[in-house]
Amino acid sequence: VVIVAVLLLTACQLITANDSRGTQKHRALRSDTKLSMSTRCKGKGASCRRTSYDCCTGSCRSGRCG
């Protein structure tokens, strides 16, 4: 019984993996969105330091988030 259950779960995972392939087209955008929602970050134009990585855009130039 355990072997049958393991085989069924494995088959379901393989089918799900094949169905979801290629559905995430904009990975970089999704990562930025996830970062801005999960942490407190500074908006565009806010003061920043290159070493703190606290801009929502991920870019700190000349002391301002870009």
From Swiss-Prot:
Gene Ontology molecular function, alphabetical: ion channel inhibitor activity
GO cellular component terms listed in the entry, alphabetical order: extracellular region
Pro-peptide region(s): 18-40
Signal peptide region: 1-17
Tissue specificity comment: Expressed by the venom duct.
Localisation: Secreted
Additional facts recorded: Negative results: does not show effect on Cav1.2/CACNA1C, Cav1.3/CACNA1D, and Cav2.3/CACNA1E and shows a very little inhibition on Cav2.1/CACNA1A.
Family: Belongs to the conotoxin O1 superfamily.
Domain notes for this protein: The presence of a 'disulfide through disulfide knot' structurally defines this protein as a knottin. The cysteine framework is VI/VII (C-C-CC-C-C).
The name this protein goes by in its record: Omega conotoxin-CVIE
Native species: Conus catus
